[in-house]
C-alpha cells in the first residue's frame, strides 16, 4: 500500500507537467511568391517626321524666323523627301535647309550630301564643327565639277537632289569667269547623280514669263519656262509645281533685283519698311523625275 502511494506520488507530477506542454503546431501551407511581371519592352524610337525636324530646338533662331517665307515642311513634303532617302543638297549656302535635312535623314537612316565649290562650304563646315553628333555625317562634295573632273556623288545613287534659290546663279555664271552660263552642265551632272525614278526639287525666284529674258542674267530672277527647258533637255520629266512659296506682292522689278527684298535688303534703310512689308521673293517650286530605265528586250 505504501509502495503504491509512493508510485502515485511520482506519476501524478509527471502527468501534470506533460499536460501543460503545448502540442506542436501543424505545419502551415506555404504561400507561393507572386510572379514578377516581365519588364516592358523599350518603346521604339519615334519615327522622324518633317514636322519634328522643323520644330527642332537645334535650329538657329534667325532661320526659324524665316519659316513664314520659306515654308520648309510643305516644301519638302511636296518633293516627297523620306527619312531613309539619300539626298544631295546643291549649294547649301549658310545651311538654312541643312539644319532641317541633316537631323531628319540621320534619325531615319538616310544620308545627306552637301554639294558645293570650296567657296560655298563655310555654312556647312560651321554646322559640322559646332555639332558633330548632328551634322558630322554630312558628306561634303564638289559641285559642279569642271575640267574633266570626276563627279563626287556616285552616279545613280541619290533618291533626291534639292536646290534652293540657285539655278539663277548658274544662269548668271556666278563666280565662273569666262563661262557665263553653266546651267546646262549643272543639270547634266544632277541627272547623273539620281537613281531612275529619283526626284529633282527646285525652288527659285520667279521671273514673269512676259519679262525680257535678258533680266535672268542680272536680276536674280528666272522664268519657270527656262528652268523647265534646262531640266527637260537634261532628260528629266516635269512632275508638277506648287505655289507654297508664291508671293503675289513681289513684282520681280526692283532697283537691285531680288536682293532688294529681304533678307538681303540691298538698299539698307532706303524704303526698308516697304520691302519688309513685301517680304521675301515670289518663288517657283518645281518637281522633276528622272525617268525609270526602259527594260531592254
Predicted features, each with a name:
Residues 46, 50-83, 100:
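Class I SAM-dependent methyltransferase Rossmann-like catalytic core
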Residues 82-93:
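Conserved class I S-adenosyl-L-methionine
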Residues 84, 107-109, 194-200:
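Short glycine-dipeptide loop
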Residues 102-106, 177-196:
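A short glycine-rich, Lys/Arg-flanked "PGG" loop and its adjoining helix->strand segment in the class I
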Residues 124-152:
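S-adenosyl-L-methionine
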Residues 150-161, 165:
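A short acidic, Gly/Pro-enriched loop at the edge of an enzyme's catalytic core
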Residues 212-241:
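Conserved Class I S-adenosyl-L-methionine
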Residues 251-297:
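Core SAM-dependent methyltransferase catalytic element
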Amino acid at each position: 500500500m505504501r509502495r503504491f502511494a509512493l508510485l502515485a506520488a511520482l506519476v501524478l507530477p509527471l502527468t501534470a507537467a506533460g499536460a501543460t506542454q503545448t502540442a506542436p503546431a501543424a505545419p502551415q501551407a506555404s504561400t507561393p511568391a507572386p510572379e514578377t511581371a516581365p519588364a516592358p519592352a523599350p518603346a521604339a524610337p519615334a519615327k522622324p517626321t518633317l514636322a519634328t525636324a522643323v520644330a527642332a530646338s537645334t535650329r538657329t533662331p534667325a532661320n526659324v524666323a524665316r519659316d513664314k517665307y520659306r515654308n520648309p515642311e510643305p516644301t519638302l513634303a511636296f518633293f516627297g523627301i523620306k527619312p531613309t532617302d539619300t539626298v544631295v543638297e546643291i549649294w547649301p549656302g549658310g545651311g538654312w535647309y541643312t539644319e532641317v535635312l541633316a537631323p531628319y535623314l540621320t534619325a531615319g537612316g538616310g544620308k545627306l550630301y552637301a554639294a558645293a565649290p570650296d567657296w560655298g562650304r563655310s555654312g556647312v563646315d560651321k554646322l559640322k564643327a559646332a555639332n558633330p553628333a548632328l551634322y558630322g555625317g554630312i558628306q561634303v562634295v564638289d559641285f559642279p565639277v569642271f575640267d574633266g573632273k570626276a563627279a563626287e556623288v556616285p552616279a545613280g545613287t541619290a533618291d533626291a537632289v534639292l536646290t534652293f534659290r540657285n539655278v539663277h546663279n548658274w544662269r548668271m555664271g556666278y563666280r565662273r569667269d569666262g563661262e557665263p552660263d553653266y546651267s546646262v552642265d549643272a543639270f547634266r551632272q544632277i541627272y547623273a547623280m539620281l537613281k531612275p525614278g529619283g526626284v529633282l526639287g527646285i525652288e527659285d525666284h520667279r521671273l514673269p514669263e512676259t519679262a525680257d529674258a535678258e533680266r535672268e542674267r542680272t536680276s536674280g530672277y528666272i522664268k519657270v519656262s527656262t528652268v523647265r527647258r534646262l531640266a527637260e533637255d537634261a532628260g528629266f520629266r516635269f512632275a508638277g509645281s506648287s505655289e507654297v512659296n508664291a508671293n503675289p506682292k513681289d513684282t520681280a522689278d526692283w532697283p537691285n533685283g531680288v536682293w532688294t527684298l529681304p533678307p538681303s535688303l540691298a538698299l539698307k534703310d532706303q524704303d526698308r519698311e516697304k520691302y519688309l512689308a513685301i517680304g521675301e521673293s515670289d518663288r517657283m517650286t518645281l518637281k522633276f523625275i528622272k525617268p525609270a530605265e526602259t527594260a531592254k528586250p
